[in-house]
């Protein structure tokens, strides 16, 4: 099945395409896209709810309108992917956990700026700082939370899990732009940068 492009009907009228990266050709395509991309929206799914020794089970990335789901359990050599990714500015939501998991399990350390949308929301005094709540507030789109308690270590992953995973990064760039603009208007961007550097 390899490089699988799936078109999903999400909560907006547009149709999204994502690539499920489980073989070398799909991974090479992703590397080329990352090299040419600007900031990369990043998230991970782990098996912390189902296993004592947690591990990264899925890595989600959005590069503009392109969305990739990388399967770390597929036996691929991800060292080149992680090296290229480390050179890109990253956008995450509640990224402390994701970066810690990637660091401890894969040795990944970002070398460029990180923008955390949850920290931005906190600095702006927004009460509901969960990703779904922020997307609802800023874009009037409901993305659902049905995948939060999934066992991400089990294969195959379901269509519902994959759709949930795509939504974790799909809106991050637009959300970061909105929150970043408000941080700048309130002269709080440096506070945010300092908090992100501490992750």
Q: What positions do the PLM features span?
A:
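Short glycine- and acidic-rich boundary segments immediately preceding or forming the N-terminal edge
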Residues: 1-18, 29
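Intrinsically disordered, low-complexity sequence elements enriched in Ser/Thr/Gly/Pro
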Residues: 3-5, 168, 186
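Conserved DEDDh/DEDDy metal-dependent 3′-5′ exonuclease domain
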Residues: 18-28, 32-42, 46-182
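Acidic catalytic cores of enzymes that act on phosphate-bearing nucleotides/polynucleotides
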Residues: 183-199
């Amino acid at each position: 099945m390899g490089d699988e492009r799936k078109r999903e009907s999400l909560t907006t009228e547009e149709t999204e395409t994502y690539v499920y990266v489980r073989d070398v050709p799909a991974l090479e395509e992703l590397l080329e896209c990352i090299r040419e991309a600007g900031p990369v929206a990043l998230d991970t799914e782990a098996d912390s709810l189902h296993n004592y020794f947690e591990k990264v089970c899925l890595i989600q990335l959005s590069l503009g309108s392109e969305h990739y789901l990388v399967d770390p359990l597929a036996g691929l050599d991800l060292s080149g992917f992680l090296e290229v990714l480390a050179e890109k500015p990253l956008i995450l939501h509640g990224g402390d956990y994701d970066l810690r998991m990637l660091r401890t399990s894969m040795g990944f350390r970002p070398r460029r700026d990180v923008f955390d949308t949850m920290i931005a929301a906190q600095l702006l005094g927004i009460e509901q700082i969960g990703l779904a709540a922020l997307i609802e507030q800023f874009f009037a789109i409901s993305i659902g939370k049905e995948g939060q308690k999934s066992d991400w270590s089990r294969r195959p992953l379901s269509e519902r899990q994959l759709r949930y995973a795509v939504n974790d990064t799909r809106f991050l760039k637009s959300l970061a732009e909105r929150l970043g603009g408000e941080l700048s208007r309130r002269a709080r961007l440096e506070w945010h940068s300092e908090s992100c550097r501490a992750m």
